Amino acid sequence: MATPSMMPQWAYMHIAGQDASEYLSPGLVQFARATDTYFSMGNKFRNPTVAPTHDVTTDRSQRLMLRFVPVDREDNTYSYKVRYTLAVGDNRVLDMASTFFDIRGVLDRGPSFKPYSGTAYNSLAPKGAPNTCQWKDSDSKMHTFGVAAMPGVTGKKIEADGLPIGIDSTSGTDTVIYADKTFQPEPQVGNASWVDANGTEEKYGGRALKDTTKMKPCYGSFAKPTNKEGGQANLKDSETAATTPNYDIDLAFFDNKNIAANYDPDIVMYTENVDLQTPDTHIVYKPGTEDTSSESNLGQQAMPNRPNYIGFRDNFIGLMYYNSTGNMGVLAGQASQLNAVVDLQDRNTELSYQLLLDSLGDRTRYFSMWNQAVDSYDPDVRIIENHGVEDELPNYCFPLNGVGFTDTYQGVKVKTDAVAGTSGTQWDKDDTTVSTANEIHGGNPFAMEINIQANLWRSFLYSNVALYLPDSYKYTPSNVTLPENKNTYDYMNGRVVPPSLVDTYVNIGARWSLDAMDNVNPFNHHRNAGLRYRSMLLGNGRYVPFHIQVPQKFFAVKNLLLLPGSYTYVWNFRKDVNMVLQSSLGNDLRVDGATISFTSINLYATFFPMAHNTASTLEAMLRNDTNDQSFNDYLSAANMLYPIPANATNIPISIPSRNWAAFRGWSFTRLKTKETPSLGSGFDPYFVYSGSIPYLDGTFYLNHTFKKVSIMFDSSVSWPGNDRLLSPNEFEIKRTVDGEGYNVAQCNMTKDWFLVQMLANYNIGYQGFYIPEGYKDRMYSFFRNFQPMSRQVVDEVNYTDYKAVTLPYQHNNSGFVGYLAPTMRQGEPYPANYPYPLIGTTAVKSVTQKKFLCDRTMWRIPFSSNFMSMGALTDLGQNLLYANSAHALDMTFEVDPMDEPTLLSLVFEVFDVVRVHQPHRGVIEAVYLRTPFSAGNATT
């Protein structure tokens, strides 16, 4: 047997252990050897000892992972704070990169959580069909409407006991069995076939809701069962627990209206009160203001509640405090009490981590352990490629018997004793061999046509685009009352939009995004696949006992090798549901009843599985200050937010004089104020939103709203020089009117800006344009997200017959769709009056519109710190002017106006590094260097 010391050195950093042959049964070893040529066992049966192979003195060193329990915890209203003592023993090195917080708690996603589209209850019912029900008229007379589906026993009458459903012959005499009113007749049972050819009159029974149960459409209706057979009737109030259940059920009998005497009921309805609920639907058409049962309320129409996925954010963004005053965290040696975590307001910890992951791997591959499922959107929703529908063939639906309505015929035959001299064949009744009741339909089978393709496309547009239009395009249905707070789920859910705003004929043939949708966050959508995945990881119920693992992201801590000593490690975890959780609708989860509580937060950590003498050698090396650990923040940037008031178009920015050495350039984008929390406070009471947070997770979508940016230093040097298409010191991003032909890619982006972006992201441009290599073209990069588009619209000026017909007066599909509402169709078939034809021989005069979208990325302007060499190029070259002097900076951004306050997020790409020194046991020191903003703030 091989001794452990004979194992090769590489086994130190691997799962080491005995060879399988040393501890498996001889028979299995023999089998493995015999089959090794075509079925290699490899290390499938390796001894699961995880440890160094020699010089091991304690079993503690052999453990792959250790659990640290907090020595102190503070559970406050808005946060949960944990304090650990990390004891790193001699000859060990703790790998902070392997640590994670193991968190258990309870999550209530609130009543606004709905993890599916449509309804789970009677989803096949027409939206406006009522349940079988009763109501009283103004004379207090009871009316009943609906279906009695269950046939009684043939030949047996309805008696006072109800509907006969069977005959018991076991005792020798036939005894009629009547329906058990507690659950029979069952709503799911009726005629098993369409065939009814025996000619006998059958009696029917059914169930109906009493008038005291308020009417709701069948679509979405649910009533809980009250007995194990599935009956749903409520118990009468007088019912006591000791007696047999007394259900609120009464029988109502009905006979044909034409009968005037000798009444004999044909129908019996078992009327009952039930606990009627609509868990996932709401009313969009309500004829009156009352909820009580009435004839008019038969016509109510339901719509499913909007889907609202709720889960933890990508990579648990927002759960741990970063970038916030006094709440950041502590990693301090107990000997020195110097905190290695320095608080800087304008760090980009979360965003930096997102971009780092993108550079390391494919973000479209989900990793459930760290909750890595990146926010995404369906590109077919953001930009609609409306190429019409392929509906060349008509689609029919047929009655169940394939015929339709029939007439009853009797048989006739040629008359044998025909009267002589009569022209034509004479006929006689044939009732000897032919039935007197023959059901025959003359002509083609009855059919109805439905354009399935067009309906699917129209439904897609309404569910995915129209319902996400800004609230100003929506209205509240008549007789429906919604909450005042527009951030609540009930308000967002109750608002409806005219389907004709986004119909199959809008922009038909074009690849175009609705202008109104361009500034709407496309990641706040039920087709956000990453959020949907993260929501479903937690399950499909409102209440979740969760158990999650959360890594540390702060760049100075996350990769640290912690040398022997005793350390204090403190961090805060948020309990603000709007920050910790993400919803696809972006509603205010605080108001809508979501809560989160933590029951335990433990820290799991790994020691490097090294032999003790190897670990001590590593420790000795790292104690030397020449081997200090240095970490660069991946983004290496100082982030500043500048407010842009509603409808403003110009934003001036001034940076005081400083030396711009080590400066790499600018990145910038635009954020909505509503979607950006105040990270400087532990709890932001004004953050009443739970959708994606571009500031933290990189879901930028307002880049297309920039027009120009000018950059001026306090010198006469033209920067970045006059060798570009446009004027120095100014970058024109898009131009609406392009007389010189400076635009590119069939959109309104300028060639100049396209060049700058290709150079900044891929160093492509001066050698000609080409598609960047795959490893450079990541999820957050420019080229992958650049979406140019164009369309033609009617030339309202030069087309003399143009009439500006507004939405209420436009008709298309009249008679086949609802009027300005997602309700029952109305109107008559008639020629459409909208839109004007842009093709064919009758095409009207048109103009071309162009635009682009570029989501997820940040605009970049690269910069060289010897920029002062970039003056006017002459025969003498470029003169060095102020190469190392300090300069003030003035920037002016020109943007499209938006009707809500926004923020300019300006990222100064700086040299951002931390150097961590651990000179003695239990001492940790950190120095943060940040140039040119060494103070950590771009305004100083």
UniProtKB/Swiss-Prot annotation:
Q: Which family does it belong to?
A: Belongs to the adenoviridae hexon protein family.
Instruction: State what induces this protein.
Output: Expressed in the late phase of the viral replicative cycle.
* Residues annotated with N-acetylalanine modification: A2
Q: How does it assemble?
A: Homotrimer. Interacts with the capsid vertex protein; this interaction binds the peripentonal hexons to the neighboring penton base. Interacts with the hexon-linking protein; this interaction tethers the hexons surrounding the penton to those situated in the central plate of the facet. Interacts with the hexon-interlacing protein; this interaction lashes the hexons together. Interacts with host dyneins DYNC1LI1 and DYNC1I2; this interaction might be involved in intracellular microtubule-dependent transport of incoming viral capsid.
Gene Ontology BP terms: microtubule-dependent intracellular transport of viral material towards nucleus; symbiont entry into host cell
Residues annotated with Phosphotyrosine modification:
Y928
Question: Superkingdom of this entry's organism?
Answer: Viruses
Entries under Gene3D superfamilies matching the protein: Adenovirus Type 2 Hexon, domain 4, Hexon Major Viral Coat Protein, domain 2, Hexon Major Viral Coat Protein, domain 3
Q: Note on file? A: All late proteins expressed from the major late promoter are produced by alternative splicing and alternative polyadenylation of the same gene giving rise to non-overlapping ORFs. A leader sequence is present in the N-terminus of all these mRNAs and is recognized by the viral shutoff protein to provide expression although conventional translation via ribosome scanning from the cap has been shut off in the host cell.
Annotated Gene Ontology cellular components are:
host cell; host cell nucleus; T=25 icosahedral viral capsid
**Keyword vocabulary terms for this entry:** Acetylation, Capsid protein, Cytoplasmic inwards viral transport, Host nucleus, Host-virus interaction, Late protein, Microtubular inwards viral transport, Phosphoprotein, T=25 icosahedral capsid protein, Virion, Virus entry into host cell
HAMAP family registered for this protein in UniProt: ADV_CAPSH
Name-wise, this protein is: Hexon protein
Pfam families attached to this UniProt entry? Adeno_hexon, Adeno_hexon_C
Its localization reads: Virion; Host nucleus
Role according to the record: Major capsid protein that self-associates to form 240 hexon trimers, each in the shape of a hexagon, building most of the pseudo T=25 capsid. Assembled into trimeric units with the help of the chaperone shutoff protein. Transported by pre-protein VI to the nucleus where it associates with other structural proteins to form an empty capsid. Might be involved, through its interaction with host dyneins, in the intracellular microtubule-dependent transport of incoming viral capsid to the nucleus.
Among its keywords, does the record have Phosphoprotein? yes
For this chain, one GO molecular function annotation is:
structural molecule activity
**Which residues does the annotation list for site: Involved in interaction with pre-protein VI?**
G765
Transmembrane regions listed in the UniProt entry: none
